[in-house]
């Protein structure tokens, strides 16, 4: 139910075209079922909670063979600007680095999503490249993503 509340927000989903708008109860149920079905040793997803309420998620998409992982996070708009995304992502990075002995963690975000870029910079990630995204934006526009990365020395807690 909490996922329905924070994900049913056009501004929240602005740079996340895979999240339908409006976000219905059926969408929320599918989101939870999908994340529960993902193998924990490859795609761990954590609920971000505040006062026993789910306000977002943070996840890693681990490639064990290359000892790398993609970081993802999404926090409800009500809680933006409070350092919660940074704190949750930092915890996931430390946990993933130790659990999987990762050599590199990376993340990408829409070039227009300055707030997300700021989170990645606060995590110590450095901009590595710019790429054309494989999906289009909500308005059918071409999307460019900036890729940030963190190597083993910076992953250690």
Model regions and ranges:
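Acyl-donor (CoA/ACP) binding surface of acyl/acetyltransferases
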Residues: 1, 5-11, 47-157
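A short hydrophobic/aromatic micro-motif that marks alpha-helical segments and, especially, helix-coil
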Residues: 23-24, 39, 139, 155
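A short helix-loop-beta-strand connector motif used in the catalytic cores of GNAT acetyltransferases and
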Residues: 33-47, 56
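Conserved GNAT-fold acetyl-CoA-binding loop/helix
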Residues: 12-34
């Amino acid at each position: 139910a909490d996922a329905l509340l924070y994900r049913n927000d056009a501004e929240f989903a602005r740079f996340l075209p895979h999240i339908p708008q409006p976000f219905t109860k059926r969408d929320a149920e599918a989101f939870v079922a999908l994340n529960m079905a993902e193998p924990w040793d490859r795609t761990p997803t954590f609920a971000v909670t505040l006062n026993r309420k789910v306000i977002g998620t943070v996840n890693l998409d681990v490639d064990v063979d290359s000892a790398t992982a993609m970081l993802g996070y999404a926090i409800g708009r009500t809680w933006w600007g409070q350092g919660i995304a940074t704190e949750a992502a930092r915890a996931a990075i430390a946990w993933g680095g130790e659990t999987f002995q990762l050599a590199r963690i990376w993340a990408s975000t829409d070039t227009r999503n300055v707030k997300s870029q700021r989170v990645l910079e606060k995590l110590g990630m450095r901009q590595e490249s710019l790429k054309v995204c494989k999906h289009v934006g909500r308005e059918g526009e071409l999307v460019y993503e900036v890729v940030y990365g963190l190597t083993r020395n910076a992953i250690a807690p």
